[in-house]
């Protein structure tokens, strides 16, 4: 059958797909469709597709409709067919899948590299031993729940069952055969939600991972490093415009830091901490430019009350003027594909901006800025049977980005609960106590950082890939635990600077239902006169069936 006829039939099937497949089926954030669609857009000379992830089947169908099927190379056509098949897949009303993975982690320095932050291959990247995804697909209503057998993210650093630690060899099996102890994470599921939607909209409520932005090393408003959001979101799109609205809930600082509360399961939920944001995306200049404006607030109430006047999907949140209860954050994103396969992008975020003659002329009590900027370029070039891909990205973040005292006008006390910031926690139960796994909501490395990252790789769809990468970072003294101080206006990196360098390569191959992969990395850290390094090796294999 001629190529054009095949592609025409595929396009017709896409047009009918919303009536066949469940339009509100939500892809996991890690699904390959997100990366493959970006590859197809850039190689065709289009700006990046929407960077508010994840997509639904209906949105994937909508985004594929922009592709000119008459102008596809052999490898582009292969990617298009894979995406079209995914977009039009009709799911049964109830389905259960399974994925079993075995991973081995080997490293050389067992004294200085014993936490998650000391590994290139992070906890979020590491696969559970077993994943059992359950999906319901009932037309306009869908749902998902993922049951996993996975090692917990804390524990005895001497155990082989821990994902990183003081042994040269560890694995993703949540059991220590030498001691008989199990390290199973009992806080699952981390993905569980209901969704409802149509051809150009979706509403999703529950737990899921999210990402807003084009960055590779991270994003400023919502980073993909957070294990899940307890959230509700709306996404709707038409022609060249997309609108998103999100509310996501986290433990209040009083709940986290109140030492009078029990550490057991009886520890009550106290207070309210809610992130609320909206996002506006425009595609301009014949689909070659994306312009995105995002604005959000972190709203807190120690009594756990929510004033419904706050919940307005179209409000200008900066104009609430609730400094003692809300901390606002705004961002601008822009990307431009200036020729086929080559794209440049930027992000700019404002958490705190001290401006005006009154502020600048103060002898004391000056507010530190909380700004962030990212500049990057991306390449997706078809080459023979595959795609040559790479990126180059630089990031600067102010020392106090994401941090602030409760009232925002006086320096933070030594009480960690005296804060209204963008450090968020996930409540978890580990054996005999409650812990709060805290990280930044936005950029994974937070403030006080200068980052340079780059990569170059080659990918053949459904066959194999290889990728080399470099990452360098200068990080100052400020972290999630630092109090916010007036008059501390030093630029990044502040104080004693830590230097991080990573250099590595990863590769993998797809063999039917099997995926075999591995990586080798060199990681070094330097702080004052201290210098440490580690060699890290990862091997893994995954078998999936539906």
Q: What spans do the regions from the language model cover?
A:
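Flexible, solvent-exposed loop segments that connect beta-strands
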Residues: 114-115, 161-175, 358, 482-493, ...
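C-terminal structured domain segments
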Residues: 498-526
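Boundary at the C-terminal end of the N-terminal hydrophobic targeting segment
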Residues: 19-23
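Outer-membrane beta-barrel channel domains
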Residues: 24-31, 43-51, 55-58, 62-290, ...
């Amino acid at each position: 059958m001629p190529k054009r006829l095949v592609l025409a039939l595929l396009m017709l099937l896409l047009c009918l797909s919303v009536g066949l497949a469940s339009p509100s089926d939500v892809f996991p954030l890690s699904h390959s469709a997100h990366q493959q669609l970006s590859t197809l857009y850039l190689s065709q000379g289009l700006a990046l597709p929407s960077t508010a992830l994840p997509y639904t089947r209906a949105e994937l169908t909508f985004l594929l409709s922009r592709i000119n099927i008459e102008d596809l190379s052999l490898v582009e056509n292969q990617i298009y067919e894979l995406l079209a098949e995914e977009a039009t897949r009709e799911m049964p009303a109830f389905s259960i899948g399974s994925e079993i993975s075995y991973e081995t982690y080997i490293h050389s320095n067992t004294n200085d590299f014993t936490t998650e932050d000391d590994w290139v291959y992070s906890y979020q990247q590491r696969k559970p031993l077993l994943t059992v995804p359950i999906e319901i697909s009932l037309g306009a209503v869908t749902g998902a729940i993922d049951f996993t057998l996975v090692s917990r993210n804390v524990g005895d650093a001497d155990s082989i069952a821990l994902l990183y630690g003081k042994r040269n060899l560890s694995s993703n099996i949540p059991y220590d055969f030498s001691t008989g102890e199990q390290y199973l994470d009992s806080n699952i599921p981390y993905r569980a939600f209901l969704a409802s939607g149509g051809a150009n909209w979706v509403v999703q409520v529950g737990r899921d991972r999210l990402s807003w932005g084009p960055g590779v090393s991270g994003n400023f408003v919502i980073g993909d490093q957070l294990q899940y959001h307890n959230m509700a979101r709306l996404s709707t799109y038409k022609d060249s415009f997309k609108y998103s609205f999100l509310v996501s809930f986290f433990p209040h600082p009083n709940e986290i830091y109140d030492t009078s509360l029990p550490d057991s399961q009886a520890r009550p939920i106290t207070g309210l901490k809610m992130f609320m944001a909206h996002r506006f995306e425009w595609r301009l200049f014949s689909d070659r430019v994306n312009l995105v404006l995002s604005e959000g607030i972190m709203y807190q109430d120690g009594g756990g009350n929510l004033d419904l006047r706050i919940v307005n999907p179209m409000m200008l949140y900066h104009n609430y003027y609730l400094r003692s209860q809300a901390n606002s954050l705004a961002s601008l994103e822009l990307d431009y594909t200036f020729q086929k396969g080559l794209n440049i992008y930027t992000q700019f975020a404002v958490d705190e901006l001290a401006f005006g003659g009154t502020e600048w002329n103060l002898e004391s009590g000056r507010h530190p800025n909380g700004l962030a900027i990212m500049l990057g370029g991306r390449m997706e070039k078809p080459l023979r049977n595959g795609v040559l891909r790479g990126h180059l990205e630089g990031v600067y973040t102010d020392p106090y980005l994401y941090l602030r005292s409760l009232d925002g006008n006086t320096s933070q006390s030594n009480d960690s609960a005296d804060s209204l910031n963008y450090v968020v926690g996930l409540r978890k139960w580990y054996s005999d106590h409650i812990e709060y796994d805290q990280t930044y909501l936005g950029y994974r490395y937070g403030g006080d950082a200068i980052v340079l990252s780059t990569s170059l790789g080659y990918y053949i769809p459904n066959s194999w890939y290889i990728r080399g990468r470099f990452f360098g970072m200068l990080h100052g003294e400020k972290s999630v635990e630092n109090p916010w101080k007036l008059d501390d206006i030093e630029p990044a990196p502040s104080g004693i600077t830590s230097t991080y360098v990573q250099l590595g390569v990863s590769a993998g191959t797809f063999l039917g239902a099997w995926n075999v992969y591995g990586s080798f990395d060199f990681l070094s850290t330097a702080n004052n006169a201290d210098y440490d390094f580690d060699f890290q090796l990862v091997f893994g294999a995954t078998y999936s069936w539906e």
